[in-house]
Amino acid sequence: MSAYQNEIKAVAALKEKNGSSWSAINPEYAARMRIQNRFKTGLDIAKYTAAIMRKDMAEYDADSSVYTQSLGCWHGFIGQQKLISIKKHLKTTNKRYLYLSGWMVAALRSDFGPLPDQSMHEKTAVSGLIEELYTFLRQADARELDLLFTGLDAARAAGDKAKEAELLAQIDNFETHVVPIIADIDAGFGNAEATYLLAKKMIEAGACCIQIENQVSDEKQCGHQDGKVTVPHIDFLAKINAVRYAFLELGVDDGVIVARTDSLGAGLTKQIAVTNEPGDLGDLYNSFLDCEEISESELGNGDVVIKREGKLLRPKRLASNLFQFRKGTGEDRCVLDCITSLQNGADLLWIETEKPHVGQIKAMVDRIREVIPNAKLVYNNSPSFNWTLNFRQQVFDAFVAEGKDVSAYDRNKLMSVEYDDTELAKVADEKIRTFQRDGSAHAGIFHHLITLPTYHTAALSTDNLAKGYFADEGMLAYVKGVQRQELRQGIACVKHQNMAGSDIGDNHKEYFAGEAALKASGKDNTMNQFH
């Protein structure tokens, strides 16, 4: 007996147990509603998706070609449409995740309006967006199953046993739109207790994976901006522990923690690390400080000094009371950060880089893997990179190293459209196309994400529509550029009433009121023009 039929049988038994007062209840309708609402709580989702992510991590360890991917989504509808599209084109959601970007929460979801990525937005906007994303994905499940149920009723009415069997199999083997989410908690929005409290909210909303960074919470900057300030390892590890305790308290034992290091581009620290003996973690952190050796007689009022190897060292302190690291130490600090995080509870790493360069990432990962052989990265394929210019310059430099003639190119102007059809541009585009595959094969990247692609796609599509609609094209701009494309490409949203749940509501009306139901999907519904 199929899972669907088992649900019907279970509800039928309940109906019989409750006698005549349940005479209006149709067991098959109730079974359908149960199947459409597979995940009852966010914790159900977090546990289910954590198991998926752990399985994917193990599969990547065995075969680096099976990496995972995601796109950042700033609204539940965007996440829903992404997963509907993935199922339509690729037939499965396997290895495809959601990403929640703190940058987009700040820019698009705050009651204060657009904000920079500096943790100034309401922290509950983060957990709120996670809940919203999964609400929309659960609705996508309900909608797709509703279409299957409607088809099943039609097959039965037509006496088509083969079609009925086919649809029953599709119902039993239905793949949910619910997938893992990697959710950005920034630097934790405060101390370790604040981190724990927000992590709980995020997990309760459905997050199986939380990404946390080693910046100072109240000095936090976007990873691609200047002025980043890191914290000593002991402070960061306390927040990793806080997230782990939140997972364990809520029973999400497989919860995943991504430890992000911003040290490559961070030249400052807010404080000198506590150290108890030479070579301990605090001492290693302090060893990267930009210091000058002084004598006791040179000590000034309020000076901060450290003693290393019998020498008095005065760290360079800025007017902001921040301390400066030595230039050129970023990669060494990143490697230390990553090894330390993995040895103290993190599952995955995130190294924020200033450019997309497989060789640069690989060099750091190779050093990390000397200590932790299965170290894996989540990597930000960031829109903050000029991908075209970066890769054209990489190819230009490779051509020079190979002794090729590059006299036809100006390295500083390679973004120009005049180079689009050149050999250099074609080689660069191919390297962009294979960047994720190459990064996973050679640089330990388990998960590739784009942080804020849907921010840019929303702006681009709106610009294209406005450009024509408010000018000479008028309504043709919408019809030609949007609706006609939706119809021809099979975009489900062209039937927007159905996408918003109108047909589900109509079926519920029939469940609840029988033949007396007043439905919205009759012959006068304009959505019938799109069949």
From Swiss-Prot:
This protein's pathway: Carbohydrate metabolism; glyoxylate cycle; (S)-malate from isocitrate: step 1/2
GO molecular function: isocitrate lyase activity; metal ion binding
Cofactors (names): Mg(2+)
Active site: C222 (proton acceptor)
The keyword Cytoplasm appears for this protein: no
Any GO BP annotation: negative regulation of single-species biofilm formation on inanimate substrate
Keywords annotated in UniProt: Glyoxylate bypass, Lyase, Magnesium, Metal-binding, Tricarboxylic acid cycle
Superkingdom assignment: Bacteria
Binding site for substrate: S101, G102, W103, G223, H224, N380, N381, S382, P383, S384, T451
Protein EC: 4.1.3.1
Coiled coil: none
Catalytic activity entry: D-threo-isocitrate = glyoxylate + succinate
Binding-site list for Mg(2+): D184
InterPro entries: ICL/PEPM, Isocitrate_lyase, Pyrv/PenolPyrv_kinase-like_dom, Pyrv_kinase-like_dom_sf
Similarity comment: Belongs to the isocitrate lyase/PEP mutase superfamily. Isocitrate lyase family.
Described purpose of this protein according to its UniProt entry: Involved in the metabolic adaptation in response to environmental changes. Catalyzes the reversible formation of succinate and glyoxylate from isocitrate, a key step of the glyoxylate cycle, which operates as an anaplerotic route for replenishing the tricarboxylic acid cycle during growth on fatty acid substrates.
Subunit organization: Homotetramer.
Protein name from the UniProt record: Isocitrate lyase
Organism: Pseudomonas aeruginosa (strain ATCC 15692 / DSM 22644 / CIP 104116 / JCM 14847 / LMG 12228 / 1C / PRS 101 / PAO1)
